[in-house]
């Protein structure tokens, strides 16, 4: 039984386009770029600056699950301590668990981060769709921000008496009466939700808030403390000579065609067997929560076992969703958001050809490279790696001649930030033979929800290349769940990064209070 439901890629794309009135005549007639924003800064194109990164943070604080450790509040405290002087915050997705519901925003987002919101001293008065940030806050959509809720309420309503109380009071699953409505809650919370405006007032709104120009393109003006909306689900901005590209990876994470095709294929049979095993594991954990929790409380901190079991159930659900995606993968063109990928290709090429740009940062939810135990092998991980690699190959082909003439060939991206995997990890790709070679990949997905372990297979990721297993990426730092029993460790993490005036522009500053062994500027 699946507790969550995810809309298809075409449904996600269409719904989000409607919400921002994508390419409405009022927008195109003004030659507005709906994928660009700008915010004012006193920094010059080569000045150093810092920014913060967090992700997978949206669990409840102070009640229900995690109420004893209050991870969201700890993250918020770190943000306040380390955020002084930061230019902006990047969020790698999954802002509100479990299903991105508008009902959960006050408890799972507004309360923990109220100090960064206008009127945050009275969080109860802040509506989730009326938030204004004091500091630039730039999120991307996570998978949980798109989820809906078809069966969970039926499950809970079918549980009676002490068992229902046990589930609700000890492991509060962070759900309300409905889900995200196909990402609508995120759109109302963070995007410029033009669909909700009267048609006759759209032009006035555009003339008031789309007043900036970047590379001769008219775009949204982001004003901290006044107007802090995003123009689209994927977008870009430039700060002190650094181009930041924020993607919606939920629309190009469909497992590759052929992975699940063929009713009698061995891979398909293996996945069916794995699915059955996962359902069995899930049933055992649900039983353990309901029937074995109270006796276990005599030997452990109250509720910790329930938290752990609920985290395992959530991980199993994500694995089940990934298997369903693999089994249903097809050859249809509508399973890939080609428009977004083409946009990224064109913007990267233009960025490299712009002498005013000194660095490039990419932000998305799903990590292309990761060694976290539940994510490294998933079809979605491999699909995002493939799609991003395909784009970077095209960019490399466009730029190759110019780079050869200049006698240099740098990585196409200075830094890639992601979440989804519940850990903090820094990887670097090697000579992959593609445009994604020699890039640092930072995963910041342990900012408040359950943490997970590194895979037992080790820190090196391999691919089959010309009949040989070749290492394509290696993990330089992994911080996640570790130990057992009294030695169990579940550190929450956020990341801070500082640019430097000399190339390469991005260097590690702090990582949740720790400094990586190697900075991103080193070869």
Where are these regions (language model features)?
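Metal-dependent phosphoesterase/phosphodiesterase active-site architecture
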Residues: 1-63, 71-90, 135-139, 145-147, ...
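Short, flexible/disordered intra-domain loops and linkers
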Residues: 62-68, 102-108, 152-158, 259-261, ...
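Core catalytic region of metal-dependent phosphoesterases/phosphodiesterases
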Residues: 69-164
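Walker A/P-loop phosphate-binding element recognition
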Residues: 358
């Amino acid at each position: 039984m699946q507790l969550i439901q995810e809309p298809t890629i075409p449904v996600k794309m269409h719904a989000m386009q409607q919400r921002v009135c994508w390419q409405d005549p009022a927008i195109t007639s003004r030659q507005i770029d709906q994928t660009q924003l700008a915010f004012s800064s006193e920094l010059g194109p080569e000045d150093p600056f810092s920014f913060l990164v967090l992700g997978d943070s949206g669990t409840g604080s102070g009640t229900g699950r995690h109420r004893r450790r209050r991870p969201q509040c700890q993250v918020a405290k770190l943000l306040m301590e380390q955020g002084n002087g930061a230019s902006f915050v990047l969020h790698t997705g999954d802002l509100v668990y479990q299903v991105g519901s508008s009902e959960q925003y006050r408890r799972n987002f507004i309360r923990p981060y109220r100090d960064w919101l206008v009127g945050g001293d009275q969080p109860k008065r802040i509506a989730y769709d009326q938030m204004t940030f004091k500091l630039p806050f730039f999120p991307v959509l996570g998978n949980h921000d798109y989820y809906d809720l078809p069966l969970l309420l039926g499950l809970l309503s079918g549980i009676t008496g002490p068992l229902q109380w046990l589930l609700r009071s000890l492991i509060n699953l962070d759900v309300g009466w409905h889900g995200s409505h196909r990402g609508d809650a995120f759109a109302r919370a963070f995007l410029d939700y033009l669909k909700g405006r009267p048609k006759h007032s759209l032009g006035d709104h555009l003339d008031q808030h789309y007043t900036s120009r970047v590379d001769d393109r008219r775009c949204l003006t982001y004003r901290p403390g006044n107007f802090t909306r995003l123009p689209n689900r994927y977008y870009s901005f430039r700060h002190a000579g650094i181009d930041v590209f924020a993607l919606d990876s939920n629309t190009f994470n469909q497992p590759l065609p052929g992975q699940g095709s063929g009713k009698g294929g061995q891979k398909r049979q293996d996945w069916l067997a794995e699915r059955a095993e996962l359902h069995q594991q899930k049933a055992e954990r649900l039983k353990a929560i309901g029937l074995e929790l109270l006796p276990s409380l005599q030997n452990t901190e109250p509720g910790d076992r329930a938290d752990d079991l609920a985290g395992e159930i959530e991980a199993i659900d994500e694995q089940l969703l990934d298997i369903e995606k693999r089994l249903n993968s097809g050859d249809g063109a509508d399973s890939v958001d080609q428009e977004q990928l083409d946009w990224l290709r064109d913007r990267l090429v233009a960025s490299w050809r712009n002498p005013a740009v000194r660095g490039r940062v990419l932000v998305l939810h799903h990590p292309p490279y990761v060694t976290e135990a539940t994510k490294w092998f998933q079809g979605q991980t491999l699909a995002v790696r493939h799609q991003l690699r395909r784009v970077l190959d095209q960019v490399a082909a466009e730029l190759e001649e110019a780079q050869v003439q200049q006698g240099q060939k740098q990585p196409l991206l200075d830094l890639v930030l992601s979440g989804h995997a519940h850990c903090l990890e820094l990887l670097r790709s090697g000579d992959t033979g593609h445009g994604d070679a020699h890039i640092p990949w930072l995963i910041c997905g342990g900012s408040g929800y359950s943490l997970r372990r590194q895979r037992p297979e080790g820190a090196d990721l391999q691919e089959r290349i010309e009949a040989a297993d070749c290492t394509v990426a290696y993990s330089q730092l992994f911080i996640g769940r570790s130990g057992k029993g009294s030695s169990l460790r579940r550190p929450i993490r956020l990341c801070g990064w500082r640019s430097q005036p000399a190339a390469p522009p991005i260097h590690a500053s702090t990582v949740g209070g720790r400094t990586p062994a190697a900075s991103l500027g080193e070869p």
